[in-house]
């Protein structure tokens, strides 16, 4: 089999590339996906409110685990990644958050990455998006990904939480992806107008999969990329339960889009990476690149949970006897509780003036429950997810075997810097102050977690060690740049090799301020033009907010927590 391009991974970026490259009817593409189809009648992936279900099994989730995390009481922590058409866009929380403009401007400060500034990238965010309230300077109106805005009156807790943030002295923003990210406001979601998950399989592949020049293989586990000298010339994979490899040749390029955990593994199995690691497994060295699998980053978060004094939370939706009605309303009408991920409000703040742009993110949820659906509080409640955005901690992904079915050694080194601890202490204390604003008085009951007895630095630190969880945002393991630890250049081309690019969240040099999916899709759109040799979209002229030393909040808290 021969194709012009072979794409490994039908995820948030891979599906973008498959769709854009096959717009040229003379270009042939093979898209390999280790998981299965995105079954449209499976409520677990298609119903926004069911977002916890895919994380509880292994049909759609790689269900990786970390090595014992040394600064987290040696816990082995979850590292869920999407498996199936759509990749992690098939199982994520559907929060459409792009990050802060200064994240991308910060990338562009690196020599050679000047074309990755915010205004260079904004046209590609817009190209990917159809926002339900129409386009403007920041948002698209005819892109493949449906974005739904929060509507008034969905749940009184959303507006109360936003208002509490404003009463605490922080800004209000009407669009976390618009002129000003900093502040509290409604959160956009990747949900269709009919209440379905807007994965990249739905948005992109649906328009491309019938093209004769696109071949899609599911249940195709990539073993390795093979080379002719320093040129990538094809891919070998295992189909289904077969132990006999299948191979195909790439006439132009192999495009690695397997994500921040799998992309470095595939490179390492293919002979690209740290020479000592490869020698350990008798893998012939094709090209030494010490940065492969290093620079691993993530967002860590924790929940502050409160009893809700009024019966307005989503607690009744967790009762089995209410779920058939919710399911029917969603299935036949695309409306109701099932049609939202219920992350409809949130915010970004600077915890201290030393940060030039927000370093803390909030997701508000009108129920008290773990992200993966476990440990639901058996009463009306609500919670704040809060976490730091740009931790200096760095980890790694390293193969433990040549077997593609063997999970790698993953270590994030969460909380390995003093800055991490300071940010989480600040975040918990600021959150408590926000929760004690007048806007929440009629709803706020007792603090369920961490609990009012948890006050000192030592107590807060111990709570974080035992209870903080991943936000499922790994990135950085094939970083873009030109230093000795960089893996790809500004166009995703792997240093020292030909015919091979990496296009996914692994190329992010530094993690962004917010959820990763929207930016991963943008990376796919921007790289697609580069691969096709097309001129970049014209640079945007939109204005964007820069704090420039402004106070982190307009006034002191209006009341003390206690």
Swiss-Prot record:
Keywords: FAD, Flavoprotein, NAD, Oxidoreductase. The active site is at 473 (proton acceptor). It is an enzyme of class 1 (oxidoreductase). Its cofactor is FAD. GO terms for biological process: glycine betaine biosynthetic process from choline. It comes from the Bacteria. Belongs to the GMC oxidoreductase family. HAMAP family: Choline_dehydrogen. This is Oxygen-dependent choline dehydrogenase. It comes from Escherichia coli O45:K1 (strain S88 / ExPEC).
